[in-house]
Amino acid sequence: VPLKRRDSFRFQQSFLSYLAINPLQNFAATLSLRQPSYNEDRARALYPILSNWMEWSETEQMQFRRTIGPRSTAVESRPNIVILQCESFSMYKSSMSGNPLNTTPFVDSLSRKGIFFERCFAPTFSTARALFAILTGVPDAQLFKFSSRNPKALNQYTLINSLEGYEKHYFLGGDAEFNNFEGVLQNVEGLQMHTGQRPSIPPINVWGISDKDLLHEAHTLFNRAKGPFFAYIQTAGNHRPFQR
C-alpha cells in the first residue's frame, strides 16, 4: 500500500513529519531558517508608514503596542462567536473588493449586514498565513514559508483568551499538524480540538471529511452547549487536490 501524505504526520515532532514527506527538499528549505535576520534600520525607516496605518499616537519611539478601548456593549451579552475560515476564498476576486463581476453577492451581503474587518489580511497566499493573521490580528510577514513553521514566531497573543467563561472549539476535517496549524492554535487557552479521523465519518479526500460533514459535526456540538462558546471552523474542500 503506498504511503499517503497524512502517514508522515504520525510523529510527535513536526520536523520528523516534514522530513518524511520529502527529505531532500525539506532539509534544504529548513536551512533558510538557521539564522533569522532582523534589520532594525529597515524597520525604523518603515515605522512611520506602519504607525500611520495602525493609528498609533506615539511615533517617536518604535513600539508596536496598540490599545483600543471597547466601542460597544455587544460582548457584555456574552454571545456565541463562530469564525468560519473559507479555504481559497480570494478577497480580490470577491464582491467585497469592488469586483465588477459581483462574484460573491451573498457573502457581500453578510459583510454589509455584519462586521467586516477590512484590515485583517495575510500579505500573500497560504492557509497557514490566514490562520495566523485571524488568530493574532497580525499579518504573517515571515519571508520564508510562513510563521507557523518558525518556532520563534509561534508564541503569540490572541484576543480569544479574554473570553472568560467560554468554551473554545476548533474544527478541521483533517489533521491540524499540517503546516503546523496546531502550533499556532496552542496560543488559545483551553481550546478543544476536533480534528483528524472520525470513526463515524469517512474521509472524502486527502484533507479529511467533507466541509458539509464538518459543519454538521459543529452544529451538533453547538446544540449541546450549556453556555457561551467560541468556535473556529476551518474548511478545506476548496483546496487541491480534490481526490484521495
Where do the model's predicted regions map?
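N-terminal secretory/membrane-targeting segments
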Residues: V1-P79, M96, S111-G114, R119
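Solvent-exposed soluble domains appended to multi-pass membrane proteins
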Residues: M54-R244
